[in-house]
Amino acid sequence: MASETPRVDPTEISNVNAPVFRIIAQIKSQPTESQLILQSPTISSKNGSEVEMITLNNIRVSMNKTFEIDSWYEFVCRNNDDGELGFLILDAVLCKFKENEDLSLNGVVALQRLCKKYPEIY
């Protein structure tokens, strides 16, 4: 299952061979009910040891749902079939944290890298 829906780095979305993939990202805005703007962590192209946030635009949503702005989700996505930029979100799971807990950006990047190297990791 994990190899069929790989967890990907946001910089590699346009090169994903799988029709369905997963990405961990933070909601920045929801301009319309069917559109999102996300930010997802990756390794900086300028400095290979720092984490930077990549903004992802032109994202369509297949479900009628209002997302929590600034919250983290894991998304199950499908690449556009028509050659346009962006992708379609098929499902989303909110990453809930206990009080005073937050997401580790370095941890997300490490998970993305491990999943690329070992696709059987779910």
Curated annotation (Swiss-Prot):
GO molecular function: double-stranded DNA binding; sequence-specific DNA binding
BP-aspect Gene Ontology terms: DNA repair; DNA replication; DNA topological change; double-strand break repair via homologous recombination; establishment of protein localization; heteroduplex formation; mitotic recombination; nucleotide-excision repair
Domain of life of the organism encoding this protein: Eukaryota
Xref: Pfam families: Rep_fac-A_3
Any one GO CC term of the record: chromosome, telomeric region
Compartments in which it is found: Nucleus
Gene field: RFA3
PTM comment: The N-terminus is blocked.
Principal cellular location given in the protein's record: nucleus
Keywords: DNA replication, Nucleus
Subunit structure: Component of the heterotrimeric canonical replication protein A complex (RPA).
Protein name: Replication factor A protein 3
Other known facts: Present with 4280 molecules/cell in log phase SD medium.
Function: As part of the replication protein A (RPA/RP-A), a single-stranded DNA-binding heterotrimeric complex, may play an essential role in DNA replication, recombination and repair. Binds and stabilizes single-stranded DNA intermediates, preventing complementary DNA reannealing and recruiting different proteins involved in DNA metabolism. Stimulates the activity of a cognate strand exchange protein (SEP1).
Provenance organism: Saccharomyces cerevisiae (strain ATCC 204508 / S288c)
Similarity comment text for this entry: Belongs to the replication factor A protein 3 family.
